Swiss-Prot record:
This is Hydroxyethylthiazole kinase. Keywords: ATP-binding, Kinase, Magnesium, Metal-binding, Nucleotide-binding, Thiamine biosynthesis, Transferase. One of its GO terms (molecular function) is hydroxyethylthiazole kinase activity. The keyword Nucleotide-binding applies. HAMAP family: Thz_kinase (MF_00228). It catalyses: 5-(2-hydroxyethyl)-4-methylthiazole + ATP = 4-methyl-5-(2-phosphooxyethyl)-thiazole + ADP + H(+). Belongs to the Thz kinase family. Its EC number is 2.7.1.50. It comes from Salmonella newport (strain SL254). It is an enzyme of class 2 (transferase). The keyword Iron does not apply. It comes from the Bacteria. Its cofactor is Mg(2+). GO terms for biological process: thiamine biosynthetic process; thiamine diphosphate biosynthetic process.
Length: 265
């Protein structure tokens, strides 16, 4: 695995391209995190769109720069809309990202996520329990929470990345980003990131948006993880708890200067 400094150098370079492109990111995400996800993308410089109706989702996925599928509040009708959007993205060669929330805990979403894998996501982002379940190596997880350390799921992530030919992100105290051949580790962040709802889901949206960038997908996705870790650290330094952390986190993303962060670490 390559060191953190390598990722930070990449992250500074990638952030400039991200803000210049402002990827139009079609987010089919869960009801709990819609606003936070949209605000996270906006703060970084992307352009979010929350189009969820089946009639609109299919054509919109074809014109977006990237698509996120997050199954956190999956229903049968929403699954139909998501499948239509993914099929459209696949045909249009729009990169799409899967966030398999609680995939090991509930059979309906497990079958749905496994079915979508045939349509070749550009990236998959999940916690250790979710990646282990999606790879078929284990089932479980406490709802949306992980019962495993990120490193424990790294072999499963690497195997899944090779099988699907995509980037897999396992998040935790240290994030691991792999294409099955190369793996990058991204430490950082702050425990307060786990005390609010939506940081993982928002990261998946940023990962999706980063997949729209030119260049190596592994480096772009690792950069996305680095941005979120750096913003989490910065926000925690000026927060008193979860309530003040959320606006501080959005401000930190908006003002993020990776080059300056590199110089002070």
């Amino acid at each position: 695995m390559q060191p953190d400094l390598h990722c930070r150098t990449l992250a500074a370079h990638t952030l400039k391209h991200f803000r210049a492109l402002s990827p139009l990111t079609h987010c089919m995400t869960n009801d709990v995190v819609q606003t936070f996800t949209a605000n996270t993308l906006l703060a970084l410089g992307a352009s979010p769109a929350m189009v969820i109706d089946p009639v609109e989702a299919r054509p919109f996925a074809a014109i977006a720069n990237a698509l996120l599928i997050n199954v956190g509040t999956l229903t049968a009708s929403r699954a139909d809309a998501m499948r239509a959007a993914v099929e459209s993205a696949y045909d249009a060669k729009t990169p799409w990202t899967l966030d398999p929330v609680a995939v090991g805990a509930l059979e309906f979403r497990r079958r749905f996520c496994l079915d979508l894998l045939s349509l070749r996501p550009a990236a998959i982002r999940g916690n250790a329990s979710e990646i282990l379940a999606l790879s078929g190596m284990a089932l479980g997880g406490r709802g949306v929470d992980t019962t495993e350390a990120a490193l424990a799921a790294l072999p499963a992530a690497q195997a899944l990345a090779r099988q699907i030919d995509c980037i897999v992100v396992v998040t935790g105290e240290v994030d691991y980003v792999t294409n099955g051949q190369r793996t990058l580790s991204i430490p950082g962040g702050d425990p307060l990131m786990t005390r609010i709802v939506g940081t993982g889901c928002a990261l998946s949206a940023v990962v999706a948006a980063s997949c729209a960038l030119p260049g190596a997908a592994l480096d772009n996705v690792a950069s996305a993880c680095c941005w979120m870790k750096l913003a989490g650290q910065a926000a925690a330094e000026r927060s008193e708890g979860p309530g003040s952390f959320i606006p501080a986190f959005l401000d930190a993303l908006y003002h993020l200067d990776v080059e300056a962060a590199n110089a002070t670490n």
